[in-house]
């Protein structure tokens, strides 16, 4: 396939046009008075959203050179979303401003490499300043404010704060669609996994079709159990120790005579046991069984560690205050494991999360962490139409990510003002000279853009507002929702510092790449077949 090339200034200008097309689409959504964007879908109803990354993902530009620029900014939005879960529009606006200011200087003869050096130094300084001014949050009211601001709905804020309160900061909060109106909070304490009983005969509560075991022993077995001879010695020990104590069996599978014997004993009322399959597959199953063992104070019975089912005693069994098993789920509440061991296991999983590159692995590790650390909260969301439901669900997910980011690194004043104050550390250009100093100045000028566009979307004169905010003290700023200046943190206009930092760092990283670009290579578009046949006066009857 033939390629076409573009060089120097032409190349950079084409990239800039692409950046502008994408950024101009996204920046109308920034701030409390931001507008919506409607995205056409080939199938189903159109999507209405004001979420930067959702819009960015949909934009493809016709001109192949410009498209490269648009895709680069898309990367900024996606990366910021992955790290902090919010701030995608801010990142896009910053990237556009950095590219615009930077290219002006490159066109005027500045060295791209030195500019990049200056930009990097400035971003590092601003990032450190933001962290230094951040305020840690642990109050429920602060959490509600962050979440409410991200979702643009104070009721959602309260709900997320409630959920965070219940599951702790490592807990899992998921969003599900419900077929009723409004929002509901569903909390599962303890460890839940998605495997239910192997036979409906195990049910103890006929009405709710669930088996509830109070204060049971818990047997955790890595392989299959099919022969009753393997299980009998242990069952006899359990009955001798305490005949009324139920037993939960978690194994790869329980089948054949082992299962039928357990069922018969349950029906006769001689012995109460429930068998469930182990959650997960392969290595993840091993890890999850290990988690359950740590939580309940038991041991995983596996031949590889020298434990055989027909030779073990009661010391390998775990315990819990209560276990509830339904057709699809098992929940273990208040496992009998030692809190030190559980804490050790939690730290081990946290270390794995730090070291993994795969998003999928990270997500699964976080699920395991949450199950050990506290519990799972499900927020059920309902709406009148499919379109509204999608939009609400999306807003909730964003708000949860923003809240996590806030709990992690703290908060700064929102509404774009934190950046305006933080770039004051760049006055004097960090002692740099020449083109490096110009790079620092580029960041200083670009950092006011998010605030400018928040003001513009509210129908005001952007640069007038930014220069006014720059004169105020730290923490003071402009509240676009009310049109007033004042202490933003007090009035609940706050941003997680992680969001603001990630937005600036990702925007700068793409902008400096773009400034140091000299050549673009794209595929030559295929000639349209149709044109060949549509007679240019040849062979048609005239």
Swiss-Prot record:
Pfam family, one: Cpn60_TCP1
Binding site residues for ATP: 29-32, 86-90, 415, 479-481, 495
Localization in the cell: Cytoplasm
GO molecular function, one term: ATP binding
Keywords tagged on the record: ATP-binding, Chaperone, Cytoplasm, Isomerase, Nucleotide-binding
Keyword tRNA processing assigned: no
Enzyme type, top EC level: isomerase
ATP-binding found in the keyword field: yes
Catalysed reaction, written as an equation: ATP + H2O + a folded polypeptide = ADP + phosphate + an unfolded polypeptide
Any single GO CC term annotated in Swiss-Prot or TrEMBL for this entry: cytoplasm
Gene3D superfamilies from the UniProt entry: GroEL, GroEL-like equatorial domain, TCP-1-like chaperonin intermediate domain
InterPro entries in alphabetical order: Chaperonin_Cpn60_CS, Cpn60/GroEL, Cpn60/GroEL/TCP-1, GroEL-like_apical_dom_sf, GROEL-like_equatorial_sf, TCP-1-like_intermed_sf
GO BP term, pick one: protein refolding
Cysteines paired by S-S bonds: none
Main subcellular localisation: cytoplasm
UniProt EC number: 5.6.1.7
Protein function: Together with its co-chaperonin GroES, plays an essential role in assisting protein folding. The GroEL-GroES system forms a nano-cage that allows encapsulation of the non-native substrate proteins and provides a physical environment optimized to promote and accelerate protein folding.
Assembly notes: Forms a cylinder of 14 subunits composed of two heptameric rings stacked back-to-back. Interacts with the co-chaperonin GroES.
Family in the record: Belongs to the chaperonin (HSP60) family.
Protein name per the record: Chaperonin GroEL 1
Species of origin: Streptomyces avermitilis (strain ATCC 31267 / DSM 46492 / JCM 5070 / NBRC 14893 / NCIMB 12804 / NRRL 8165 / MA-4680)
